[in-house]
């Protein structure tokens, strides 16, 4: 997934940082300027990076040039685990990551990726509101400040081969990100063997058929051209791709209170605007894939089996990854 992950964060943040362009302002004195080194898997020149730059202009405007973002895009800093490690080591200051990356910092956040738990946007909004303070404290306790949440469309199963019920995955090669215990457990519950590789290896894996099935949004599949290697798409979704942006706590609190407020406010406004774009574009991508000839799979006749696998996955992860109180 250099490509998927790139797409993933392209999407997940699609809007994670959209903000109207601001007027340019004079640079602050170099001795007073704070540069936030921000790691992203989004490719240079992508729509996401254009949005990131718009966020940066607004941040610079709001802080009168005292704070700005410096982007390290295209996975130049590695995968999400590398981002988090480098932020902790002081080599980076912030990163945009998926729930998998967020879970490396605060493991209970992975509950948001549990299959079948959050499948509609209104559910996501309620859950995000209800758990935001709790998760924010978890991030702080682990040395990070949560800047915002983002999303990247509805998670669906895509495959090169036909499928309809959970049992069909036993003869397929489903990908599970090596740092994601949630989907890997889901695959194990079904009785299949997940292909556990890092994000940068996924696209090549599809080319060589090392793997043939992936959980991804229609938006990501179109943006990264995955659809050219995938033939089947589930009509029903397993969840919603969720992620966010985090910054090292020491870096954040080194800013003045005014600049902290500007950073949080601009990122939050951007994220919410981006959510609207992600939802719209994911729906358009879904329709586009159907028009391009991908075979739509109706999994509803086997809903009971899918729901049972999802419920067993959540049960298995409760107490090991997240607490029952989060469900």
Question: What do the predicted segments below correspond to?
Answer:
Residues 129:
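An acidic, glycine-rich surface segment that forms the CoA-thioester-binding/catalytic face
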Residues 25-123, 135-327:
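N-terminal secretory/targeting leader peptides
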Residues 9-21:
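Bacterial N-terminal signal peptides
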């Amino acid at each position: 997934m250099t490509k998927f992950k790139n797409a993933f964060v392209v999407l997940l943040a699609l809007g994670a940082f959209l903000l109207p362009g601001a007027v340019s302002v004079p640079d602050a004195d170099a001795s007073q300027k704070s540069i936030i080194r921000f790691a992203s898997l989004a490719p240079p020149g992508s729509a996401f990076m254009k949005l990131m730059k718009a966020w940066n202009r607004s941040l610079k405007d709001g802080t009168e040039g005292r704070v700005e973002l410096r982007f390290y895009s295209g996975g130049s800093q590695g995968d999400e685990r590398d981002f988090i490690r480098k932020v902790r080591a002081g080599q980076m200051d912030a990163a945009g990551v998926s729930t998998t990356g967020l879970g490396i910092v605060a493991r209970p956040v992975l509950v948001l990726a549990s299959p079948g738990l959050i499948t509609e946007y209104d559910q996501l909004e309620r859950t995000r509101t209800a758990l935001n303070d709790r998760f924010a404290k978890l991030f702080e306790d682990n040395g990070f400040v949560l800047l915002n949440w983002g999303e990247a469309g509805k998670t669906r199963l895509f495959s090169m081969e036909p499928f309809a019920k959970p049992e069909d995955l036993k003869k397929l090669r489903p990908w599970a990100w090596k740092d994601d215990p949630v989907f890997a457990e889901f695959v194990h519950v079904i009785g299949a063997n997940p292909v556990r590789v890092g994000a940068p290896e996924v696209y090549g894996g599809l080319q060589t058929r090392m793997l043939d099935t992936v959980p991804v949004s229609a938006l990501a599949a179109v943006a990264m051209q995955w659809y050219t290697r995938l033939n089947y798409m589930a009509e029903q979704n397993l969840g919603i791709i969720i992620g966010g942006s985090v910054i090292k706590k020491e870096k954040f609190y080194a800013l003045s209170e005014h600049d902290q407020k500007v950073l949080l406010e601009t990122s939050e406004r951007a994220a919410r605007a981006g959510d609207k774009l992600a939802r719209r574009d994911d729906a358009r991508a879904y329709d586009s894939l159907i028009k391009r000839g991908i075979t739509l799979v109706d999994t509803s006749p086997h809903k009971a089996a899918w729901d049972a696998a999802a419920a067993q996955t959540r049960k298995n992860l409760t107490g090991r990854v997240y607490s029952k109180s989060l469900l």
